[in-house]
């Protein structure tokens, strides 16, 4: 693997292509030689693509869904413009010079409507379109220099009057040459032609020429909006020859000229794309003398332009080149916020994002693009090392990235990453370690016991008495979230284009500890890289830490430990690391530490207990290798139950408190999910009780106070979640524990006989139902479970027990609660939250279902429909559990999911979702029960179909028919038939009857439905034998003898489809068997006398037709015979 060159300059931003639009163009058939994309525009909601065939495709940016197609017969689409302040309007110009303004009517769910068609520029080439920023007005410029305005009226009365009284098209001006670009802001229209730029006050109808010097060629101009908060006036930037720009004030006066010629001599930055690996050439080129054909305002500080060679982004106020990259053959560019949509000369469209380097790497990491992320880090080393980037790209993330790369393939890349990590964090910076949560504005001293005394350097601290809370030992969740969000705000696209010199503006204020007792604190457990010398010292540290609550001292005692084996799983990314590390946040002292001690002490009893679990785990894993155990369910359950007893003994709530206290009292408090204000109250209450117990000389009471102050051993079992491990677990052992614990859940081995310290057998857990046992198992061993396997097991084994699913979701919520993305999901509307979910959460994250749950709780069914884009990360089986209280909403999701596939793929797609097969009947029963007509409309009192009831509207008829037509075994088909009959879904019932060869039942129900169309046409059910015809005629006779005629749905026999009676069936019989055989069969059934003259005439016509047909056939045969004989002669 070649060595990746390092870009010497510290570039803060890069252009990145995270997704390709080629599949979209292919689906729209805009990638052929006959039809291609000719124009492009973008707004907050839409991506508009004009085609050479005159069609305008409107694609919803959320999910890239094709929503509308607007056709034009006046030629190819040459220009498109979306109204930025109202997404419901779009303007297009055709190759013939017509301008059409459309109202999309998306909010009212109506059909798009042509608001106005302007022929003002007919016969000319429209070169520019621009919308007013406040009202519905479109400015149009053509190649002859004419500029006009189309003012729209939205009310119906105004539309009607416009044709007779008003003149919606107004000629603004005619400039001396072709209009290159139009831009509008705050009542001013900016016109750039081939020779100069003009500023027009459209309200007062005044015009100014910008500058005195003319130019010759295509040069753009754009407005540069000022900052509203700072009262800054908008500016204008006009392109000039030789890579120059004029900076112009809002009155049209040239302020200064900016020269970018020498700045553009630097090599181009690579575009980060999945199509190829980024390449960088250090060779500096000569200065570029360019003409900028258009200027576009991008984000907040930047101006974008392009040439045939590449894309250039400037910060004109600072006379800086933010970046330039080689992107070939660009025809046009549309921008929205920090997004660029580039239309190329061959009709292709590329989607680029202007993004900071650190955020680019983060997005690549979330998508699992390890090679590309590593190369980007190595290319932009100077940017990654910058202080601002280090807050986002921590060394832990770089270590995790390195662990994902294959040593054989990416050896050079791994060595470069290692060098980067060394630069990122020097080895001797102990107090600034990447795993330390102590603020750099705090100092600490080491006491004789090995405890670190943290000394805050903040000013204006509160009283000593208030500073003694548990929260003072760790950073609060709120403060960490504020720090994180401040980093995120720095990376917002709209503010990402600041100058290079602005990186030092990051706030470095010291962390302030909240100490108000009445405030609710959220404990936030995070490992610290400080270890005391031995377990005994660590125990003494806990005692002193607990005593500090009673004495109300001002010292902050930290006894938190980091894991000696901290290592992230390879498959985990981003924020998932916090929940599924190979070693949990809290650790036990390492054996090496005890060996270093000169004082020989006997190991505490908890180590023996943990050693016992290791032996039991190794023994259980060995037994699982035996096929006689692995494939025999009873033997497997016995092995798991025996092992589970050791696990319960080790992690028992009562007996394991000593381990927790020995490790870290405050970290143990942080692992359990409790109401924090209650935990604080418990701390103060237990402090008072501890003082009383001290008078009895009970030394152990001090050791247990930190744990018992928050919970009781067994009474609060139902309220606790063990999210993270209470002590350090080696990587190999943790994997074995996870495998066995998950296997216990899958095989429903959820408890065993536990012997307490008093020696008796505890049967309390065995008295509960399986659902309660499963919930308790999840809460106790959540930190050991394989979350993906656990989720699937719960869906299969406890599909009818919503409490188990709810418990699992609660555990995931607790895991995600410390994630800033989870906090951010509480803000904004549904599209904003969906975009955040799409950008920030990996699709393979087990926490994805939690975010989906939050969206559903907030937005209901609309959120479910939006979750279709996350399939297959979120499956229908997840959704049905998520909304088990509202099955109708699940059915709406399932119907939308199936309809999102092409028509010819829906059946196979639905079949792939039916795992297990039992879901078929469940979903069918749900579909025929919801949004269905009342049973009184489909069946009579005897259970037979009412006439024409098969024509009633069913909300999910297409989904039902898809389910029915899928292949299945005989028993399943019979059950589906019974479901359709009991619910009165007669179209499906008839299909299933004919599949099961229950033709007698089918014809019986067809007669009751009284619709001849069921027996006509290519898909009609026509009797195949004489016996079936006799049966059908007999059924009609029986029906006609009933005392009251069956009324149609409309209440009249004359309305609706043709009824099934003797004459209509006789006519069908005559057409199928011939008039003579039909007559004889009718006579045999005694129905010949009931026929009218119409039947007789029809039979006569059929006889004549048959005679002519026979004659024609005979004639053709004779001609063929003569022809063949002539050929032989």
Curated annotation (Swiss-Prot):
The keyword Plastid does not apply. It comes from the Eukaryota. It is found in: Cytoplasm, Cytosol. Its main location: cytoplasm. Widely expressed. Isoform 1:Highly expressed in lungs and testis. Isoform 2:Highly expressed in placenta, kidney, testis ovary, lung and thymus. Coiled coil: none annotated. The modification Phosphoserine is found at residues 532, 534, 695. One of its GO terms (biological process) is platelet dense granule organization. One of its GO terms (cellular component) is BLOC-2 complex. Residues 483-503, 561-609 are annotated as: Disordered. Keywords: Albinism, Cytoplasm, Disease variant, Hermansky-Pudlak syndrome, Phosphoprotein. Component of the biogenesis of lysosome-related organelles complex-2 (or BLOC2) composed of HPS3, HPS5 and HPS6. Interacts with HPS6. Interacts with HPS3. May interact with all alpha-integrin chains that have an aromatic residue before the first lysine of the conserved KXGFFKR motif, including ITGA2, ITGA3, ITGA5 and ITGA6. It is linked to Hermansky-Pudlak syndrome 5: A form of Hermansky-Pudlak syndrome, a genetically heterogeneous autosomal recessive disorder characterized by oculocutaneous albinism, bleeding due to platelet storage pool deficiency, and lysosomal storage defects. This syndrome results from defects of diverse cytoplasmic organelles including melanosomes, platelet dense granules and lysosomes. Ceroid storage in the lungs is associated with pulmonary fibrosis, a common cause of premature death in individuals with HPS. May regulate the synthesis and function of lysosomes and of highly specialized organelles, such as melanosomes and platelet dense granules. Regulates intracellular vesicular trafficking in fibroblasts. May be involved in the regulation of general functions of integrins. Belongs to the HPS5 family. This is BLOC-2 complex member HPS5. It comes from Homo sapiens (Human). The gene is HPS5.
């Amino acid at each position: 693997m070649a060595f990746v060159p390092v870009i010497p300059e510290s570039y803060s931003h890069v252009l990145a292509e995270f997704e390709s639009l080629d599949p979209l163009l292919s689906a729209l058939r805009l990638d052929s030689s006959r039809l291609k994309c000719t124009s492009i525009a973008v707004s907050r909601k839409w991506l508009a693509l004009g085609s050479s065939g005159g069609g305008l495709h409107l694609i919803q940016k959320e999910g890239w869904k094709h929503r509308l197609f607007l056709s034009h017969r006046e030629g190819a689409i040459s220009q498109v413009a979306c109204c930025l302040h109202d997404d419901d309007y779009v303007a297009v110009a055709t190759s013939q010079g017509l301008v059409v303004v459309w109202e999309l009517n998306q909010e009212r769910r109506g059909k798009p409507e042509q608001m106005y068609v302007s022929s003002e520029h007919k016969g000319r080439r429209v070169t520019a379109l621009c919308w007013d920023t406040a009202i519905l007005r479109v400015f149009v410029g053509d190649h002859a220099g004419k500029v006009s305005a189309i003012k729209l009226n939205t009310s119906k009365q105004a539309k009607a009057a416009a044709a007779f009284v008003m003149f919606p098209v107004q000629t603004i001006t005619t400039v001396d040459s072709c209009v290159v670009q139009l831009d509008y802001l705050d009542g001013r229209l900016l016109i750039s032609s081939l020779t100069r730029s003009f500023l027009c006050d459209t309200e007062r109808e005044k015009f100014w020429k910008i500058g005195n010097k003319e130019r010759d060629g295509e040069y753009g101009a754009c407005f540069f909006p000022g900052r509203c908060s700072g009262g800054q006036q908008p500016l204008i930037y006009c392109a000039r020859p030789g890579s120059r720009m004029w900076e112009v004030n809002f009155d049209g006066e040239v302020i200064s000229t900016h020269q970018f010629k020498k700045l553009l001599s630097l090599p181009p930055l690579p575009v980060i794309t999945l199509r190829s690996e980024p390449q960088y050439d250090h060779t500096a080129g000569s200065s570029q003398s360019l003409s900028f054909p258009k200027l576009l305002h991008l984000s907040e500080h930047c101006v974008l332009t392009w040439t045939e060679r590449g894309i250039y982004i400037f910060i004109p106020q600072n006379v800086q080149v933010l970046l330039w990259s080689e992107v070939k053959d660009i025809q046009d560019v549309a921008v929205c916020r920090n997004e660029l949509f580039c239309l190329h000369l061959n009709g292709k469209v590329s989607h680029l994002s202007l993004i900071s380097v650190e955020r680019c790497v983060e997005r690549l990491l979330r998508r699992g693009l390890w090679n590309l992320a590593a190369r980007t880090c190595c290319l932009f080393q100077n940017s990654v090392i910058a202080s601002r980037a280090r807050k986002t790209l921590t060394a832990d993330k770089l270590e995790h990235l390195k662990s994902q790369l294959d040593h054989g393939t990416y050896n050079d890349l791994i060595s470069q990453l290692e060098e980067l990590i060394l630069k990122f964090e020097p080895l001797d910076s102990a107090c600034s370690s990447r795993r330390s949560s102590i603020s750099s504005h705090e100092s600490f001293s080491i006491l004789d016991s090995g405890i670190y005394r943290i000394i805050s350097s903040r000013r204006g601290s509160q009283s000593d008495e208030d500073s003694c809370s548990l929260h003072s030992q760790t950073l609060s969740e709120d403060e960490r979230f504020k720090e994180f969000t401040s980093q995120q705000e720095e990376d917002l696209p709209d503010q990402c284009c600041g100058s290079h010199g602005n990186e030092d503006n990051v706030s470095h204020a010291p962390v302030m500890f909240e100490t108000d007792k009445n405030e609710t604190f959220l404990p936030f457990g995070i490992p610290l890289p400080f270890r005391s010398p031995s377990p005994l010292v660590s125990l003494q540290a806990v005692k002193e830490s607990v005593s500090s609550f009673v004495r109300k001292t001002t010292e902050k005692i930290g006894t938190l430990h980091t894991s000696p084996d901290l290592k992230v799983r390879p498959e985990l990314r981003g924020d998932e690391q916090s929940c599924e590390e190979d070693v949990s946040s809290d650790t036990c002292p390492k054996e090496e530490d005890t060996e270093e001690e000169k004082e020989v002490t006997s190991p505490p009893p908890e180590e023996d207990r943990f050693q016992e679990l290791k032996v039991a785990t190794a023994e259980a894993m060995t037994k699982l290798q035996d096929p006689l155990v692995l494939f025999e369910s009873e033997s497997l359950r016995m092995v798991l139950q025996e092992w589970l007893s050791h696990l319960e003994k080790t992690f028992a709530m009562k007996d394991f408190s000593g381990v927790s206290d020995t490790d870290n009292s405050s970290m143990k408090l942080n692992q359990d999910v409790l109401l924090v204000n209650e935990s604080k109250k418990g701390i103060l209450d237990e402090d008072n009780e501890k003082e009383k117990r001290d008078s009895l000389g009970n030394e152990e009471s001090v050791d247990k106070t930190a744990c018992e102050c928050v919970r009781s051993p067994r009474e609060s079992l139902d309220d606790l979640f063990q999210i993270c491990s209470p002590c350090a677990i080696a990587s190999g052992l943790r994997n074995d524990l996870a495998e066995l614990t998950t296997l216990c859940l899958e095989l429903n081995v959820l408890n065993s006989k536990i012997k307490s310290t008093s020696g008796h057998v505890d049967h309390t857990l065995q008295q509960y139902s399986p659902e309660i046992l499963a919930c308790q198992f999840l809460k106790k061993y959540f930190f050991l479970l394989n979350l993906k396997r656990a989720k699937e097991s719960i869906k299969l084994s406890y599909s009818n027990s919503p409490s188990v699913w709810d418990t699992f979701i609660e555990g995931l919520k607790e895991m995600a609660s410390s994630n800033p993305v989870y906090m951010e999901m509480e803000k904004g509307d549904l599209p904003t939250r969906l975009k955040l979910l799409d950008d920030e959460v990996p699709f393979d994250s087990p926490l994805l279902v939690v975010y989906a749950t939050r969206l559903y709780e907030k937005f209901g069914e609309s959120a479910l429909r939006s979750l279709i884009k996350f399939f297959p990360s979120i499956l229908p089986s997840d959704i049905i559990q998520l909304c088990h209280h509202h099955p109708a909403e699940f059915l709406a999701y399932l119907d939308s999911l199936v309809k999102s596939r092409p028509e010819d793929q829906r059946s196979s797609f639905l079949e792939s979702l039916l795992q297990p097969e039992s879901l078929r009947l469940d979903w069918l029963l749900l579909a025929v029960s919801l949004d269905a007509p009342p049973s009184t409309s489909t069946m009579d009192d005897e259970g037979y179909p009412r006439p024409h009831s098969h024509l009633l509207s069913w909300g999910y008829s297409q989904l039902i028919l898809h389910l029915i037509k899928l292949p299945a075994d005989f028993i399943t088909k019979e059950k589906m038939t019974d479901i359709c009959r009991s619910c009165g879904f007669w179209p499906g019932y008839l299909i299933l009857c004919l599949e099961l060869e229950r033709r007698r039942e089918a014809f019986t129900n067809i007669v009751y439905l009284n619709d001849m169309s069921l027996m006509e046409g290519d898909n009609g059910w026509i009797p195949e034998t004489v016996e079936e015809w006799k049966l059908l005629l007999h059924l009609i006779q029986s029906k006609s003898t009933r005392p009251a005629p069956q009324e149609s749905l409309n209440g009249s026999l004359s309305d609706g489809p043709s009824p099934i009676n003797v004459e209509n069936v006789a006519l069908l019989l005559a057409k199928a068997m011939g008039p003579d055989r039909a007559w004889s069969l009718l006579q045999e059934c005694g129905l010949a006398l009931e026929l009218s003259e119409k039947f007789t005439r029809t039979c006569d016509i059929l006889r004549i037709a048959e005679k002519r047909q026979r004659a024609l056939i005979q004639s053709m045969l004779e001609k063929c015979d003569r022809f063949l004989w002539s050929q032989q002669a």
